Amino acid sequence: RPEMEWLAAQLGDRFTVQDGRFTDFAAGDAVYRFFELFDLANVPNASRILELAAAETIRLTPPPKPVFEEKMLFALLWNRNLHDFWRRELGEKFFQRLRQAVPYTWLVDPAPLPPHAALPELGLTDWRQLKTLSQRDRDLILKISGFSPRAWGARGVYLGSDLSQPDWAAAVERALADFTESPFVLQRYHKPARVDAQWFDFDRQTVVPMPGRVRLCPYYFVTGDREAAGATLGGVLATICPADKKIIHGMTDAILAPCCV
């Protein structure tokens, strides 16, 4: 909330930050949703906001589309059964380009495989065999898919090569046990690039250099109505964590900065 209040103040009187009980919206208001869909029961005015958005009385962003809050979409991109669908919907060129950017992703489903079958790319016949992989072979990362209070801030992220064997085994077991309520995905871990960054220390009034690792998050906005609607790149957020951090998120030690597009 402090960050949003600061941002609204920089933008002028047209923008205000309201709490979870505010319902006095006016027709045509643009509302930024600063809560996730898993948290609807804890946001008193959430149902009112969604009702007004459905009636097109207000413009709501991000749109309340659960698919965009689930990482398992990445696993569906790699699912061979859906390749024809993706080619038809995305086009062959963009489909291949997207697969170059998205790491191979598996949905961790505890359903038993036939004795002669194996998990694609992994060569394992049971998810529990992940637990016995050597640290060198555990260059894999488990992530809770979404729709959970553990799905942000790296709370539900487990990097195999960074954990002891017992801790990694416990993470695998938890992922299997939580499948019906909070599914996990497994991805190959790609080490983020190292960059030289700087941040401004307001206490010392000086610029401080910081070697770090960066994550880029593009923000797309839908403009136009109905058939004329299209996605437009609105900006890119760079999150730069200290170089010794292996999982990038908006931690207190991170630099969060807009990028030039």
Description of each model-found segment:
Residues 1-261:
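Domain-scale recognition of functional cores that engage charged ligands
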